Structure formats: structure tokens, C-alpha cells
Amino acid sequence: MTITEATKANLRRKSGFVDNVQVIDGVPLFSWVDINITELCNRTCVFCPRVDEALYPNQNLNMSIKLTDKIASELAELNYSGAIILSGFGEPTLHPEIYGIVSSLSGPYRLEIVTNGDKLTTTSIENLTNAGINYFVVSMYDGAHQREYFETMFHDAGLGEDAFILRDRWHDGEDDFGLKLTNRAGVIHTGQQPEINVDSPCYYPAYSMMLD
């Protein structure tokens, strides 16, 4: 998979939730809830606030299951059908009660986990899946050799390619970290940008929220 293909796959992962939101009494409801369940991370990336320890220190602070129970209950009251993403600025697999957190948040929506993959094993993938995770997002920072490693791990856990995405994040700043910007609503024309339907409503300003 080339960088462009990997990036497009990642954009497709979110586009359905950005473009198809619930509208309640004429007001769009958020469709993408990013939850920062832990302040722990085992890496320091140059494009993350954690690169400056004075600004964002590594702390052993973890969201409680009592709080995630409350979040899940309030989302149920809204008949929420978007996505919940366990990510934020921490490494979610470092949460000491990660399986309980996942089980607490499991519901009639997509439940993703975004991870650097350092703590993943075939067994932990199986346990996370059984607890309620239905999509894995792995950011690979060490090199292209990680692709085969993680593909084998997920396949050994019984998951197909529709249950995970491997994002190439091992690029440096000169290569924009392997990321590709969107066309910013049609005002940027660098590279080949797909045409968009300008007559459709835009929910981008309201689709996402973060809970910390």
C-alpha cells in the first residue's frame, strides 16, 4: 500500500461520519467522539504536544469506568449512532483497565481504538475485540517492516482487513510525516484532489468532539 493509498483509506474511514450526521430538530449532532482515556504514552512524537514535557508531561492519570459508564448512558439517551474513538493524546492500551473501559463504552455505534501498536499482541487484540472494539487504527512509527508484522498479528487474531487500518507514520518532517492535507473546501489545488459535491450540506464544523 503506497502512502497515497494509505492516506486515502484513512480519509475514507472518517468521511462517512463527517458527511452523514444525525440531525435533531434541525441541528446536526456530533458524529465523532474522541475520548482521551489515559494521560500515559510510551512514545514522544515530534508532532504531538508531548514532545514538550513542560507543556504536556506524562502522567499516570486514567479515566474511570464510572465516567465511561456515564458517557455511554448519555450517548444512549441521544440515540447516538456515530463513532467513538479511544485516542486523544495518550496510548489507550496503557490504561490499566482497558478491557473494562472498552466494555463500558460498547454500544450500537462504531468503537475504535487508535494505538501505536507497541503493546498489541494476538491475545490483546482478541480481548479488545471481545470487549467491544470493532475497528483498530495502528499508527506505525518505526518503518515499513511493521506492516507485515501487524497484518500477521491481526490475521492470527481472526480479523479481516475490514477490521483494521495500518497508517504509515514513520516519515520525517521533510516528508510531512507521510500525511496529506485535504483541499480545504476547494481552495487548495496541490496534488490531485477528488471533486466534491458543493451542493451538499457541510457538517465539518460540528461533527467532532473530544472528551478528556
Model regions: which residues?
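Radical SAM enzyme [4Fe-4S]-AdoMet core and its adjacent flexible, acidic
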Residues: 2-9, 24, 36, 57-58, ...
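Conserved alpha-helical substructure of the radical SAM core
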Residues: 2-135
